[in-house]
């Protein structure tokens, strides 16, 4: 039975095949290559794509030529100068756009790429040193590191690592409860780098190290002594933390051989809890500056404030009065610039004329010097040029008043 069924299937297949028209197999006679001339290539009709609402809308919209020529009648024309003058801009995806404040033109700086910048960076990496210029994303880095002479090539060395135990809302330095151990070779390496550069003035600062019993004060003092040993003519400014209010540690650093003791109050008293870490208070910072002056009356004391955080004129007047009450010699004002979106937002970009106003006000109150401007930072080189000259005049036995007059031109030149 199975054999009969198989025979019937064979007969059906044979008869069906015989009834179909016989065709000769097609032979491919042409080949197409990526470089074949279009005249010799086999022509093929592309498969049409499925139309979508997005495609229709895109095709019906303005072309590139419309954007270039400005022939879009549906949108008002904006002069390029007006476009750059816009103070705010909407950014983000549709439905979630946020209004962001544009950076005003007086705060824009060039990207650092000079040979001197690369040389300083290479030296720092080779000696495993850190700078606040890089860690805090200072906008002046191209200016301070870009020059070829000692006045223009200024670096602020950050001691005790690149990780802080505190987390201020304005600062971009890394934070941790337990940073890495101190590098015992750092004081020697720092002194070696500074003597190699031949700078007349150097700024040392540090992260806060609340994990250490002395807050790193002895490490700081040892670095100053090493620098003075290798480069005795170099003037040293130390921008320190508050050492958790331990005034004995403040005195230790103040008597280490430095020339300028700096500690920043950062902002006015009313805004301090919001701007700074909870362990840093306005009154504690004032006490640090007072203790430094008492420990070493010959040392120049210095502090700095950021503007644009929402402070009022009355609050700034109060802050300046508190600084003068403890005989602070130098004060600087600079614009707060948000380092990342995770940090505190800028309340306002203060116009340069207000920085001029606060410079005049500080001088009226009796400060020895005030550097004030949107891009001024606590280690700004114009202030350093002034302090450097004043200290050298002091060493030569010239009075402060005479020194101020003689270096006024140099200060103005450095500020430019």
Curated annotation (Swiss-Prot):
Residues 20-52 are annotated as: Disordered. Its cofactor is [4Fe-4S] cluster. The keyword Metal-binding applies. [4Fe-4S] cluster 2 binds at residues 164, 168, 171. SMART domains: Elp3. Pathway: Protein modification; protein lipoylation via endogenous pathway; protein N(6)-(lipoyl)lysine from octanoyl-[acyl-carrier-protein]: step 2/2. [4Fe-4S] cluster 1 binds at residues 133, 138, 144, 379. Gene3D superfamilies: Aldolase class I. GO terms for molecular function: 4 iron, 4 sulfur cluster binding; lipoate synthase activity; metal ion binding. Residues 147-368 form the Radical SAM core domain. It comes from the Eukaryota. Its main location: mitochondrion. One of its GO terms (cellular component) is mitochondrion. Its EC number is 2.8.1.8. It is an enzyme of class 2 (transferase). Residues 29-46 have a biased composition (Low complexity). Belongs to the radical SAM superfamily. Lipoyl synthase family. This is Lipoyl synthase, mitochondrial.
């Amino acid at each position: 039975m199975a054999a009969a069924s198989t025979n019937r299937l064979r007969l059906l297949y044979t008869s069906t095949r015989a009834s179909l028209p016989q065709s000769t197999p097609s032979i491919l006679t042409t080949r197409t290559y990526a470089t074949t001339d279009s005249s010799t290539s086999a022509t093929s009709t592309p498969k049409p794509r499925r139309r979508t609402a997005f495609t229709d809308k895109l095709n019906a919209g303005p072309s590139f030529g419309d954007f270039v020529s400005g022939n879009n009648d549906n949108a008002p024309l904006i002069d390029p100068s007006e476009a750059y003058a816009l103070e705010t801009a909407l950014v983000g995806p549709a439905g979630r756009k946020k209004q962001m404040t544009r950076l005003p033109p007086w705060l824009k700086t060039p990207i650092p790429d000079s040979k001197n910048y690369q040389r300083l960076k290479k030296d720092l990496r080779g000696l495993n040193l850190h700078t606040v210029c890089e860690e805090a994303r200072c906008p002046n880095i191209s200016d301070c590191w870009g020059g070829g002479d000692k006045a223009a090539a200024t670096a602020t060395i950050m001691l005790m690592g690149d990780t802080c135990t505190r987390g201020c809302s304005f600062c971009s330095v890394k934070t941790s409860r337990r940073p890495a151990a101190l590098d015992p070779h750092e004081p020697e390496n720092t002194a070696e780098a500074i003597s190699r550069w031949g700078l007349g003035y150097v700024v040392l600062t540090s992260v806060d190290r609340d994990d250490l019993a002395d807050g790193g004060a002895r490490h700081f003092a040892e670095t100053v002594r090493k620098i003075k040993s290798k480069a005795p003519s170099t003037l040293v400014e130390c921008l320190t933390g508050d050492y958790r209010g331990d005034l004995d540690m403040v005195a230790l650093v103040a008597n280490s051989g430095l020339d300028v003791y700096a500690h920043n109050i950062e902002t006015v008293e009313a805004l301090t809890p919001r701007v700074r870490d909870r362990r840093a208070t306005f009154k504690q910072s004032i006490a640090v500056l007072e203790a430094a002056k008492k420990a070493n009356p010959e040392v120049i004391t210095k502090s700095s404030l950021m503007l644009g955080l929402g402070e009022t004129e009355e609050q700034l007047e109060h802050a300046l009065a508190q600084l003068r009450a403890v005989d602070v010699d130098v004060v600087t004002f600079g614009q707060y610039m948000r380092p990342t979106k995770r940090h505190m937002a800028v309340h306002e970009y203060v116009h340069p004329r207000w920085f001029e106003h606060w410079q005049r006000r500080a001088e009226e109150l009796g400060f020895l010097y005030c550097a004030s401007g949107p891009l001024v930072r606590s280690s700004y080189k114009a202030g350093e040029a002034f302090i450097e000259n004043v200290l050298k005049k002091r060493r030569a036995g010239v009075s402060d008043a005479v020194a101020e007059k003689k270096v006024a031109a140099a200060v103005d030149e450095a500020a430019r």
